Design a protein with these regions (language model features):
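Glycine-rich phosphate-binding loop of ATP-dependent small-molecule kinases
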Residues: 2-531
């Protein structure tokens, strides 16, 4: 949702559309160092109406359940961030506001990609989430204290932009607040608190630390704000000296932003109309290159199956696995044998090492979140293995075919999925993706067999027959999916599955090869570090 919520008289940044094209740093904090203040009489006169309006818009947000509100809190220590959020909780219904603080990463978080900790805390549609210590705090602290260099900061900035763009495209309304104090104001505030026996406890080590690194923090903060203020998620710089001004400004920005978003027509599609995808002119698909006659006889199958299962068992116990997690994605035609292949993989492992996640239609809670949210919840820790039976690719397959999302939604999903998988790769997750392919005649034979065999009858449903009628549509969607998401980061493996034995062995062998290649890269990297 492209909502630049805010009131022009309170937005202290240049137009974000103009700002995003500037190449030189701007003194964008100057307007937050001029002594903004609201007298007590004015504050007391305005608060009742503002509070009533905020409650009204908050309950309308809850009733409509069309989008979540995400509030990112950043800025100078001592500039009133916590006090302002406390005030908002007093003015609004705190039961509908989830305040989250991201301090030092826990062991659970360190074992997963960096974005995992944020995805699992996203507010559902109809609710508000306040994030302290968010992705901007992490990148700024890292750069100020020399834990990362400029190149890594630029990567983090680009990652934040992609994350926010996706959340907004999924409907989220994002407010980004930078609470500011000049260096002189910050030191004066800290001294006043330190001299007050009743309030000195409010000063944290981080406050004193930031007073020493103020110039660097503001320098890199300006760079981050300049690079990430966009029309869909602009920054609002708030002078933090006067609590009355601070509270009214934030309250009015939230009010007008939410009012504007709620006025948009229901079901309004996000984004522009995408360029159309056309079928291959010569009707050829990558699936046509598969040799569907490949098969294994029973003796060869049993020998190779045992060999590959033993190989997988050993690789999963390898000490180098402690630096990695493994994710396998199983997609394919109905009746292509995904379940049988997954069982042969699981048979090689200790049940404590893996988790199988069957994916069906999203639940009510899952529909209240961005579509990738439910998959982020299941990303394994290092040393562990998660099998997805169906996956995030439903966005560009069944949701595309059945019209469950707009063309703009599934078209942008290719890039979002590539970014998601790159984040996994960068965190040490090995992603192996399978499309199990069978021809139309083989599918018909398996459907008929399922109807004829009582203990297999549960496997066949009306949806299977209905999907079969859309064979050509799915074939085109699979071709587009492979073309756009088979990358160096995470390639698709197309599995000839007319013969189930061949398919099962190929799946196991591919997983083993992926693990061995990842371990070899780990060895090379460790050897280079030792030098």
């Amino acid at each position: 949702m492209a909502i630049a919520g805010g009131i022009s008289s309170y937005v202290l940044l240049p137009n974000p559309l103009v700002l995003s094209h500037l190449e030189t740093e701007l003194p964008m904090f100057e307007s937050a160092e001029i002594g903004h203040a609201i007298d007590k009489d004015t504050f007391d006169a305005e608060v009742p109406a503002l509070r009533e309006a905020l409650l009204e818009v908050q309950y309308e947000l809850q009733q409509q359940k069309r989008f979540p509100v995400i509030i990112l809190i950043n800025g100078i220590e001592g500039a009133g961030k916590g006090e302002t959020v406390k005030l908002l909780n007093e003015w609004m219904d705190p039961r509908l506001i989830e305040v989250r603080t991201f301090d030092q990463q826990t062991d659970e978080e360190l074992a997963r990609p960096p974005a995992w900790r944020y995805w699992r805390q996203l507010p559902a549609k109809g609710r508000m989430g306040v994030f302290f210590g968010n992705w901007y705090s992490q990148m700024l602290q890292g750069r100020v204290h020399g834990q990362i260099k400029d190149a890594r900061l630029d990567q983090a900035i680009a990652g934040a932009e992609r994350l926010e763009k996706m959340l907004c495209d999924e409907g989220a309304l994002i407010f980004k607040f930078w609470f500011h104090l000049s260096k002189k104001q910050m030191k004066a505030r800290l001294k006043a608190l330190a001299d007050d026996p009743l309030h000195s406890w409010r000063i944290s080590p981080l406050d004193w630390q930031q007073s020493e690194t103020y110039d660097k923090f503001v320098h890199f903060g300006e760079r981050v704000l300049r690079r990430t203020s966009r029309d869909y998620a602009p920054w609002h710089v708030i002078e933090g000296v006067d609590s009355n001004y601070r509270g009214l400004t934030v309250g009015k920005l939230l009010l007008e932003g939410m009012q504007n978003a709620l006025k948009l027509p229901k079901g309004k599609a996000s984004g522009m109309n995408p360029a159309p995808l056309i079928a291959s002119v010569d009707k050829k698909s990558l699936l046509d290159s598969l040799d569907m006659t490949l098969r294994l006889d029973k003796d060869d199958y049993e020998e190779q199956l045992i060999t590959e299962q033993a190989r997988l068992s050993g690789l999963m116990r390898d000490k180098r696995m402690r630096k990695h997690a493994l994710v396998t994605v199983f997609e394919g035609n109905d009746a292509a044998g995904k379940g049988g292949a997954i069982r042969r993989v699981a048979a090689a492992l200790d049940p404590r090492q893996y988790h199988i996640v069957p994916i069906a239609a999203p639940s009510e809670d899952e529909r209240a979140q961005p579509y990738l949210w439910r998959f982020w919840q299941k990303i394994p820790a290092r040393g562990m293995f998660t099998v997805f039976d169906r996956s995030w690719y439903g966005r560009v397959l069944v949701e595309r075919i059945e019209g469950f999302c707009t063309p703009a939604d599934w078209m942008r999903a290719y890039g979002e999925i590539n970014d998601f998988e790159e984040q996994l790769r960068d965190a040490g997750v090995i992603v192996v993706k399978f499309w199990l392919a069978i021809d139309k005649q083989t599918q018909l034979e398996r459907f008929q067999a399922r109807e004829d065999i009582p203990f297999k009858r549960f496997k066949i449903t009306e949806d299977d027959w209905r999907n079969r009628d859309k064979w050509d549509d799915y074939r085109a969607a699979v071709g587009d999916m492979v073309d756009r998401t088979s990358t160096e980061v995470s390639a698709w493996t197309l599995v000839e599955a007319n013969d189930k034995r061949w398919a099962r062995v190929k799946v196991l062998r591919t997983i083993n090869q992926a693990l061995e290649e990842a371990f070899a890269k780990t060895d090379k990297h460790d050897k280079k570090k030792r030098k």
